[in-house]
């Protein structure tokens, strides 16, 4: 009798816990995205949108030095946005006539449709569409990319190599800390869980918060160059914009695409004759030294490489903007 009464009280306790947890969970899942900081708000309001197949794509387009014909297009990484380039933006405008960056579909201030089959091919088509929108489809373009953007650049390079009409005419390509080789790429644990989580992935994306995000991202920065709390909040605010946290698992399918299309994308890098450069933060745990660099130099012996200081990691343009900019300008001025 005593045991039965104890079981009854335990069941009642769990019911009460459940009744309390349901509204708390509902409130948690409907927490609004954080407000944009003044700097991030300024970045958004100074940008523009264009429409690609009914979807709004955010971009920045600055006119820089007068009299120069040079154009540079910046392709950002995962899971952030074009705001990754803000520390070197002014420096680029002193060298280029046009400095252009976009938020890929599913990133930043661009639309984040769901469900949607996000692909590198679509992102490359969006870049081409943006340049047509700006009337630059027949101009020679310098590409500067990072991480996820490196893969998009590889697809653009493949299309350029095919010499098809309507494709970009690429003058040069500079990559940085991207997993262009599947065999040397080391994704984070959270990325693995979201990419291959199946029915669990949508639950994980809904439960993701600033604490989980910041603890996951901070280790890919060097020990002396980690982002401040406010910088992390800026990154998180951009991800949460348009419920971007809910499409992260879909965006991560690019890792599988990279394996499937390795021959196409690595082959494009190895076979073109344009100047190619790589800026490398050697402390990168995602593309580790020396395995990555050895394979890169073996596969692309004609490419030049800039290795930044030993403590610079996966986000070199944020961790060492001056070193990154100097390395890029050295490359651009070499041909």
From Swiss-Prot:
EC number: 3.-.-.-
Record key words, sorted: Endoplasmic reticulum, Glycoprotein, Hydrolase, Membrane, Transmembrane, Transmembrane helix
CC annotations in GO: endoplasmic reticulum; endoplasmic reticulum membrane
Gene Ontology biological process: regulation of lipid storage; response to retinoic acid
Localization, UniProt: Endoplasmic reticulum membrane
Domain of life: Eukaryota
Signal peptide: none
UniProt motif RVIALD: location: 98-103
A GO molecular-function annotation: hydrolase activity
Glycan-bearing residues: 163
EC top class, as a word: hydrolase
Keyword Transmembrane on entry: yes
Tissue-by-tissue expression: Expressed in mesodermal tissues. Isoform 1 is exclusively expressed from the paternal allele in all fetal tissues and cell lines examined, whereas isoform 2 is preferentially expressed from the paternal allele in a tissue-type-specific manner.
Record-annotated AB hydrolase-1 domain positions: 71-310
Statement: the UniProt record of this protein carries the keyword Disulfide bond: no
Residue spans crossing the bilayer: 13-33, 63-83, 266-286
Topological category with respect to the lipid bilayer: Multi-pass membrane protein
PANTHER family: HYDROLASE, PUTATIVE (AFU_ORTHOLOGUE AFUA_2G14860)-RELATED (PTHR43798:SF33), MONOACYLGLYCEROL LIPASE (PTHR43798)
Family of the protein in this entry: Belongs to the AB hydrolase superfamily.
Protein name stated in the entry: Mesoderm-specific transcript protein
Organism: Mus musculus (Mouse)
Lineage of origin: Eukaryota, Metazoa, Chordata, Craniata, Vertebrata
Gene name tied to this protein: Mest
